[in-house]
Regions:
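Beta-sheet-dominated scaffold domains
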Residues: 65-66, 101, 140-271
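A broadly used, surface-exposed interaction patch
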Residues: 36-61
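WD40 beta-propeller blade core
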Residues: 31, 76-77, 163, 207
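Hydrophobic core register within WD40 beta-propeller blades
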Residues: 4, 56-58, 96, 147, ...
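Short loop/turn segments that connect beta-strands within beta-propeller blades
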Residues: 35-38, 79-82, 120, 167-170, ...
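Hydrophobic or amphipathic alpha-helical targeting/insertion segments
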Residues: 57-87
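Surface loop/turn motifs at the tips and blade-to-blade linkers of beta-strand repeat domains
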Residues: 46-51, 86-90, 136-140, 178-183, ...
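N-terminal beta-propeller domains
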Residues: 1-42, 92-164, 245-269
Length: 271
């Protein structure tokens, strides 16, 4: 698959969870299957398609759980498990998160902006003083590469730094604080919220952010990583961080750890 997504959904009719695993295939179509139904098959989500890097989020709107999907050269969709809706005026997003009932997103072709939807309405992207809008980042931090919801803030990762956005209520009350300036490039596909920290890879190696401070972790790993880290990707599961990247010798690897001082291990997949 090209990507995997989790649609967190509650079925009011049965009073049970109805979470769906959604898979993007190599032909850029999407299929879903039930997480909790044993033996369930994959079903195509008709007319949901992507072009380029995709992203997703879950949002409860008008009493329904929605799966939100977008891609850098595609459209923005909402899906309630039955009905798919294309939102024509939304930007093409490369990452998104939900915070304080708004969607915050990085957008294809607008490398110095973070967009946000109207309050309590993920379908409204019309720019206005009390609706949707965007925040410009024009200093030396480089491109905006990913947004992450963490500890009641939106953390905005850039090529060479991290900003913390406080965003509750009206746009006029939004505020941005620079919390980290990097001397080495940050790789967007390695940024993973993991419990009480966000872990990410830079040209210098692995680092973690606790919301206020950044520190180096697993320093010995840097000796094994190739200087070309552009294709590095990571995910998190059960409190562990899994990273796939090129090494200094042929093959790929995955690394997992629970924190920076215990339960660490490197696993070479030779793939």
């Amino acid at each position: 698959p090209m990507s995997l997504h989790l649609f967190r959904k509650f079925d009011a009719a049965t009073n049970k969870r109805d979470d769906r695993l959604i898979v993007r295939t190599t032909d850029n179509e999407y299929y879903e299957t039930s997480v909790f139904t044993v033996g369930d098959t994959f079903r195509k989500i008709v007319n949901l398609a992507a072009a380029g890097k995709d992203c997703s989020a879950c949002y409860r709107y008008n009493g329904k759980d929605l799966f939100l999907a977008s891609s850098e050269r595609g459209f923005f969709y909402t899906y309630d498990g039955t009905t798919l809706k294309k939102i024509e005026n939304a930007p093409n997003m490369t990452s998104m998160c939900v915070h304080a009932e708004r969607i915050f997103a990085t957008v294809s072709g607008e490398q110095n902006k973070v967009w946000f939807s109207a309050d309590f309405n993920p379908e409204n992207w019309k720019v206005s003083g009390d609706g949707a809008g965007y925040i410009d980042f024009d200093d030396e931090g480089g491109k905006v590469i990913k947004v992450v919801k963490f500890l009641n803030y939106v953390y905005i990762f850039r090529d060479f730094g991290v900003e913390r956005l406080t965003a509750f209520g009206a746009q006029t009350d939004f505020s941005v604080s620079k919390i980290y300036t990097a001397s080495a490039r940050i790789y967007p596909d390695t940024i993973v919220p993991l419990g009480d920290r966000i872990v990410f890879l830079t040209e210098e190696g692995l680092k973690c952010l606790d919301g206020y401070n950044v520190q180096n972790i697993f320093a010995d790993l840097s000796d094994f990583l190739s200087s070309d880290k552009r294709n590095a990707v990571a995910t998190g599961m059960d409190g562990k961080y899994f990273l796939a990247a090129n090494m200094v010798f042929p093959g790929d690897f995955a690394v997992k750890f629970l924190d920076e001082v215990r339960d660490q291990g490197v696993y070479n997949t030779n793939g």
